[in-house]
A protein has these predicted regions:
Chain B
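Hot-dog-fold acyl-thioester-processing enzymes
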Residues: 1-85
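HotDog/MaoC-like acyl-thioester-processing domains
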Residues: 1-3, 87, 92-146
């Protein structure tokens, strides 16, 4: 277990990099129950003006959750709160990078400002995670 | 046209979800949560969980069932074709494990208009079979061109 107490304001957390494959949105649709066709049907997505089928926002949020949980060795009890703003469309077959900086630290609790981006496209902004030693 | 705010404060009946091991494994695979505590009963118990534990973001699975009726309610009046998921917050408490029965209640907290867009804010509260709160969700949906 990484010690959250060792983190201090301004520290960067390790980046999480993940490239969703072409069919990831289909698997996430099944796992989550969200079968909105804009996520799984490229032709439907184009017909409503999108460049192609887009990633589920909540899947991207799950990557932000995972990126933050890494600092507690992925212990699911450590993540106490996560807020995100969805500000861009994410696409399959493009690398998603989650990065963050410690905003507050003390008493075994840390608050981390986080973003998720595909290249220069920030798909999640102003995300804030709060973690505490379980 | 101003947004109709009559539904502020409306609450929908609780939706019940029974948490199962294979759904936890499927969800953990889909989001890339690699830990054994999401897959192996004994691994989870050995680090203090009651049983195989769901990743925190599994909350979307049991919350979605409670959010659906709220988003589709004509009293709220959301135009789904122009709806975007604007922001999301979850606050977690008690972990959710295989065998848990989760009740989720949705309440409409805010409806307002800004820059020609309608903002619809819902709160979900999920509790387990022991009455312990497992997660609170705040869902902000934005509807363009209201």
């Amino acid at each position: 277990m990484s010690d959250l107490k060792d983190l201090k304001e301004g520290d960067a957390i390790p980046e999480l990099k993940v490239t969703p494959d072409k069919y990831l949105p289909h698997r996430y649709a099944g796992a989550s129950g969200d079968f909105n066709p804009i996520h799984i049907d490229p032709e439907f997505a184009k017909a409503v003006g999108l460049p192609g089928n887009i990633l589920h926002g909540l899947w991207m949020m799950a990557q932000v959750a995972r990126g933050n949980a890494q600092i507690a060795d992925g212990d699911p009890r450590a993540l106490k709160r996560l807020s995100v703003q969805f500000r861009g469309m994410g696409f399959p077959e493009q690398e998603l990078v989650v990065s963050g900086t410690v905003k507050e630290a003390g008493d075994g609790r840390v608050v981390i400002d986080t973003i998720a981006a595909q290249g220069g496209n920030q798909v999640i902004r102003n995300a804030q995670a709060e973690l505490a030693a379980p | 046209m101003p947004v109709n705010t009559d539904a502020i404060g409306k609450q929908w009946p609780a939706a019940t979800y029974e948490v199962g091991a294979e759904k936890i494994r499927e969800f953990a695979d889909a989001i890339g949560a690699g830990s054994d505590v999401h897959r192996d009963h004994e691994a989870a118990k050995s680090v203090g969980y009651r049983d195989l534990v769901a990743p925190p973001m599994f909350c979307v699975v049991y919350s979605a069932r409670a959010m659906g009726p709220a988003i589709l309610d004509p009293d709220v009046g959301i135009n789904l074709a122009t709806m975007l998921h604007g922001s999301q917050e979850f606050e977690w408490d008690e972990p959710v494990c295989h065998g848990d029965v989760i009740d989720t209640t949705t309440t409409c907290r805010e409806i307002y208009e800004k820059d020609g867009k309608g903002f619809y804010v819902f709160e979900t509260i999920s509790t387990n079979q022991e009455g312990k709160q497992v997660v609170k969700g705040t869902w902000t949906n934005i509807v363009r061109g209201v």
